[in-house]
A protein has these predicted regions:
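Selective transmembrane helix interface/packing segments
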Residues: 2-442
Length: 442
């Protein structure tokens, strides 16, 4: 599917001419096993990695180096008591985790994990399916997973899960727009929305370098999409316990937990496909022909997705949770305008290349550098003046309708009793508490 009127080279799509039903079945089973195995590995890597970053051992009892800890947790979830709230909408309560898990596992259907390989004498691409609008399929399925979260929060008829569901829906809407705009520049450069053709277009240069601003926007939006720190507001433990998962137990909770980590693998795979050359070998190994053929592609794909997985784990260990207003300001007032501005520049430069014979990486490197410099200048000069604080007319008493409340802007806080306490008075109070009879006699 050609998107632009420019003279974009037509890249070769995946060849499914020898595909059979049993090959498709084998690849579907392989994708499920691949995702579950990577989730188990991700749990171990995250816990050991966080322990290392926080100067503690992490899991080290269940198996060598704690490798079996994830299996122990899975067994615990399987045999936990299955409970639900009495007022819950029973059908939707059970359906919601299944929707979230189904949407998470469906994304990999159109992800090219390698070039054509030979299986039992049949040449087939390491991809379950491809279509001219495969990238739109990914965005649509990612949005479908939101229904599992919203229905799960609403069907429990409980306050905290509903808060988590509303937060999650606002978060996905805010950051999926910026993510979609960052991917449009990839479609313009590749001339297609087919994932296999996008990978083929990155045979020489990865879009992560040519379209660096779009790559950065995608990475930030991807973290918000999967509800990970510092954007885990739908599951903020200190505010709403576990968000939409608060009233779930046993394997229903396990499906939500599994879908969260599968979604991490999904956004990593999409980043690899759209910006990191897909299954192509990294430079300088890309110049060795046999390293870009056969089963080698699966190795490069695996290493690239784990590069992004490690970045998300590292981010969790490093950054604190954003405040909700900061989070929404970042999505709507920062990422969206930057993504739109970059998209306009990409379309403009794509048209200029029809008249100026310059390599894409040179032209976009210069334009991208100027774009980033302009953003830095705007950021440094955009210092809003603090608004004057109007003094409150009411006297601060420390209580409002019987509840303790903090002072409003302009009100003077009450003096703390501890601020005026003396050492003699403190010792006398402590002595009275230790010897109440003597204090009464006095």
């Amino acid at each position: 599917m050609t998107l632009a009127p420019f003279a974009v080279p037509e890249y070769t799509a995946a060849d499914f001419s020898q595909e059979t039903w049993w090959l498709s079945l084998i690849k579907a089973v392989f994708i499920i096993v691949f995702l579950i195995a990577n989730v188990l590995l991700a749990l171990w890597v995250e816990r050991r990695g966080l322990g290392r970053m926080q100067t503690r051992p992490g899991p080290n009892v269940a198996g060598p180096l704690g490798l079996f800890q994830a299996f122990a947790d899975a067994g615990k979830l399987l045999f936990k008591e299955d409970m639900w709230t009495r007022r819950a909408e029973r059908f939707l309560y059970f359906l919601a985790p299944a929707i979230a898990a189904f949407a998470a596992f469906s994304v990999y259907a159109v992800i090219p994990m390698g070039p054509n390989v030979t299986i039992f004498g049949h040449s087939t691409p390491m991809q379950l399916a491809d279509m001219p609008v495969a990238s739109l399929y990914i965005l649509a399925i990612a949005s479908l997973g939101l229904y599992g979260i919203v229905l799960g929060g609403w069907s429990t008829r409980s306050t905290l899960p509903l808060y988590g569901a509303v937060r999650s829906s606002a978060q996905v809407i805010s950051y999926e727009l910026a993510m979609g705009l960052s991917l449009v520049s990839v479609f313009l450069m590749s001339g297609s929305m087919s994932t296999s053709q996008i990978v083929a277009a990155q045979g020489q240069f990865w879009w992560a370098f040519t379209l660096f601003p779009a790559f950065v926007i995608y990475c930030i939006s991807a973290v918000g999409e999967v509800n990970r720190l510092p954007f885990d507001l739908p599951e903020a433990e200190g505010e709403i316990v576990a968000g939409h998962m608060t009233e779930y137990s046993s394997m229903k909770f396990g499906w939500y937990y599994l879908s969260e980590y599968v979604n991490m693998l999904n956004v990593s795979a999409v980043a690899t496909t759209m910006f990191f050359g897909g299954w192509h070998a990294p430079w300088p190994l890309s110049h060795v022909e046999f390293l870009n053929s056969g089963w080698w592609g699966l190795l490069w794909f695996f290493l690239k997705i784990w590069f992004f997985m490690f970045l998300m784990i590292w981010t969790r260990a490093t950054l604190l949770r954003f405040r909700y207003d900061q989070f929404m300001n970042l999505g709507w007032k920062r990422l969206m305008p930057i993504a739109l501005g970059w998209l306009v520049l990409v379309a403009l430069v794509r048209g200029i290349t029809q008249f100026v014979q310059l390599p894409n990486h040179v032209l976009f490197g210069g334009v991208g550098g100027l774009f980033l410099i302009a953003l830095v200048i705007i950021w440094l000069t955009d210092k809003p003046e603090p608004e004057p604080v109007a003094a409150s007319e009411r006297e601060y008493t420390g209580f409002e309708d019987g509840f303790p409340v903090p002072p409003l802007p302009g009100q003077t806080p009450l003096a703390s009793p501890r601020a005026t306490a003396t050492i003699e008075g403190t010792l006398a109070t402590a002595s009275a508490l230790e010897n109440p009879k003597e204090a009464t006699d006095e």
